[in-house]
C-alpha cells in the first residue's frame, strides 16, 4: 500500500509534468477593453443589487415600527406629554414639560422608545 509521502510525491510530479506541456492557444480570449467592460458591468450590477436590498431592508424596518401619535412619559410620579413625529422618528418636548417638580433648575430625562436600533453579536 502507498504511504502518504508516496501519494504526495506522485501528485507533485504529475503537476510538474502537466505544467511543462506546450499550450497552443496562449492568446487572450477577450480583448482588454472587453474585459474591462465586463468587469465594470458586473460591478455596477452588484452595486444595484446592494442598493435594492438596502431599500427593501429599510422599507421593512420602517413598516415594523408601531408608534403612537402621542406618547405619555411618566417620571417620578409626574406625567408629561410629548408628541412623536412618525416621519422623522424623534420625540419633541418643550422645556417646561421636562422641568423637574422637585427642583427649579433640574430636568427630567424622558424615556424614548426607539425600535429602530439594530444590534448584532460581536
Curated annotation (Swiss-Prot):
Keyword annotations from UniProtKB, A to Z: Developmental protein, Membrane, Transmembrane, Transmembrane helix
Membrane-traversing stretches: 33-53
Subcellular location: Membrane
Membrane topology: Single-pass membrane protein
Recorded superkingdom: Eukaryota
Pfam families: MAP17
GO cellular component: membrane
Cited InterPro entries: PDZK1IP1/SMIM24 (IPR031627)
UniProt note on tissues of expression: Expressed in prospective pronephric mesoderm at the late gastrula stage. After neurulation, expressed in the intermediate mesoderm, eye placode and blood islands. Expression becomes restricted to the pronephric proximal tubule during embryogenesis, but is absent from the connecting tubules.
Induction data: By retinoic acid.
Keyword Transmembrane helix: yes
Main location: membrane
Alphabetical GO biological process terms: pronephric nephron tubule development; pronephros development; pronephros formation; retinoic acid receptor signaling pathway
PANTHER family: MEMBRANE-ASSOCIATED PROTEIN MAP17, PDZK1 INTERACTING PROTEIN 1
Biological function: Essential for pronephric tubule development, acting upstream of pax8 and lhx1/lim1 and downstream of retinoic acid signaling to induce pronephric mesoderm to form pronephric tubule-specific cells.
Family stated for the protein in its record: Belongs to the PDZK1-interacting protein 1/SMIM24 family.
Protein name in UniProt: Proximal tubules-expressed gene protein
Amino acid at each position: 500500500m502507498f504511504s502518504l509521502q508516496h501519494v504526495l510525491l506522485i501528485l507533485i510530479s504529475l503537476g510538474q509534468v502537466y505544467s511543462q506541456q506546450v499550450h497552443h492557444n496562449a492568446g487572450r480570449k477577450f480583448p482588454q477593453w472587453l474585459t474591462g467592460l465586463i468587469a465594470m458591468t458586473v460591478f455596477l450590477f452588484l452595486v444595484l443589487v446592494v442598493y435594492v436590498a438596502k431599500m427593501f431592508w429599510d422599507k421593512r424596518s420602517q413598516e415594523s415600527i408601531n408608534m403612537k401619535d402621542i406618547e405619555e412619559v411618566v417620571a417620578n410620579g409626574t406625567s408629561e406629554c410629548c408628541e412623536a413625529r412618525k416621519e422623522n422618528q424623534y420625540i419633541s418636548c418643550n422645556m417646561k414639560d421636562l422641568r423637574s417638580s422637585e427642583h427649579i433648575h433640574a430636568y427630567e430625562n424622558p424615556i424614548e422608545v426607539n425600535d429602530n436600533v439594530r444590534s448584532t453579536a460581536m
